[in-house]
Design a protein with these regions (language model features):
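Strongly charged
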Residues: 1-94
Length: 94
């Protein structure tokens, strides 16, 4: 399902204009992105958590030149679904 399909679905279920739904969806994504950029996690009860994970520095190999390279410590965005959400997906796809 794409973002456009989500907007259409929400619009049809709520009766709210697509333009208004799009603004709300875009604002939600913007808040999540900005929070994570600032190192804050976002928790949505019953859905899941958008968390910032720290990746440690590690040594990797450049196989074309056969040299070792250092990948510095960095942060990556991650999503951890809520247990309720995981259970519904497990039982719903039969």
């Amino acid at each position: 399902m794409t973002k456009a399909e989500i907007i259409t679905e929400i619009s049809s279920k709520t009766g709210i204009e697509k333009v208004d739904v799009q603004e709300v969806v875009e604002a939600f994504f913007k808040v999540v992105k900005n929070s994570m950029i600032n190192g804050e996690n976002v928790y949505v009860r019953g859905f899941g958590s958008f968390v910032v994970k720290k990746r440690a520095e590690k040594t990797a190999r450049n196989i074309s030149k056969n040299t070792a390279i250092i990948i510095p410590e960095h942060f990556v965005p991650s999503f951890k679904p809520a247990k309720v959400f995981v259970e519904k997906v497990k039982t719903g796809n039969k």
